Amino acid sequence: MDKKSARIRRAARARHMMREQGVTRLVIHRTPRHIYAQVIAPNGSEVLAAASTVEKVISEQVKYTGNKDAAAVVGKVVAERALAKGVKDVAFDRSGFKYHGRVQTLADAAREAGLQF
């Protein structure tokens, strides 16, 4: 089993549990150059809020889009957008990535901005 398939297996297991519980999810995805975050409805078919370093508004605020500073900005923005839609409680779906570095920074910034998980 290679690294990518192991990550996808971990993500599938976590998503299965969240789907059974019927909770709103804060889903992240990271690449070496960008980080993405979405708040997905419990039914899994609707994106309630989203933010990523691809957006011009966010990429203008940071020098480089693939570091912790960029992840913190994305976490803050996605939390603000979710709160504007009335979503306060979410489950953190790290998509099989380790809770370390940019993933942890995004989560901490979202918590500081008002999301609870």
From Swiss-Prot:
InterPro entries: Ribosomal_uL18_bac-type, Ribosomal_uL18_bac/euk. This is Large ribosomal subunit protein uL18. GO terms for biological process: translation. Part of the 50S ribosomal subunit; part of the 5S rRNA/L5/L18/L25 subcomplex. Contacts the 5S and 23S rRNAs. CDD domains: Ribosomal_L18_L5e (cd00432). It holds the Pfam family Ribosomal_L18p. GO terms for molecular function: 5S rRNA binding; structural constituent of ribosome. GO terms for cellular component: cytosolic large ribosomal subunit. The keyword Protein transport does not apply. It comes from Pasteurella multocida (strain Pm70). Keywords: Ribonucleoprotein, Ribosomal protein, RNA-binding, rRNA-binding. The keyword Ribonucleoprotein applies. This is one of the proteins that bind and probably mediate the attachment of the 5S RNA into the large ribosomal subunit, where it forms part of the central protuberance. Belongs to the universal ribosomal protein uL18 family.
